[in-house]
Amino acid sequence: MIQQESQLKVADNTGAKKVKCFKVLGGSRRRYATVGDVIVCSVRDVEPDSSVKKGDVVKAVIVRTRNDIHRKDGSTLRFDTNSCVIIDDKGNPKGTRIFGPIAREIRDRGFVKISSLAPEVI
């Protein structure tokens, strides 16, 4: 579960390393976000010569959470980190590569481009 003030790692090659969530999109008083939800966040830590700068406000989709993901078949899934992928206003990823596995729920939410760039979909 990701909420306001949560810090996430960035799982793409835009140059951002860490972001801080300050809004969960999808409802007027929505508190938590899980895998596949879109958040608005601020870039906190960047690599040199990156396409995003520190302090930039970006949209991101959550691809991994430490909290359990419960599936309809009864199985659960948990990752080691809270991670996201930075997207543009149309929902396409800003980076050209995605690092690490992502959950299958990303494709179900309509982010097909992100799931096709990922090396492994669990």
Curated annotation (Swiss-Prot):
CDD domains: Ribosomal_uL14
Gene Ontology CC: one annotated term: cytosolic large ribosomal subunit
Record's keyword terms, sorted: Ribonucleoprotein, Ribosomal protein, RNA-binding, rRNA-binding
Disulfide bond in keyword set: no
Coiled coil: none
SMART domains in the record: Ribosomal_L14 (SM01374)
InterPro entries in alphabetical order: Ribosomal_uL14 (IPR000218), Ribosomal_uL14_bac-type (IPR005745), Ribosomal_uL14_CS (IPR019972), Ribosomal_uL14_sf (IPR036853)
Disulphide-bonded residues: none
Gene Ontology biological process terms, A to Z: translation
Function recorded in the entry: Binds to 23S rRNA. Forms part of two intersubunit bridges in the 70S ribosome.
NCBIfam families: rplN_bact
Quaternary state and interactors: Part of the 50S ribosomal subunit. Forms a cluster with proteins L3 and L19. In the 70S ribosome, L14 and L19 interact and together make contacts with the 16S rRNA in bridges B5 and B8.
Protein name: Large ribosomal subunit protein uL14
GN (gene name): rplN
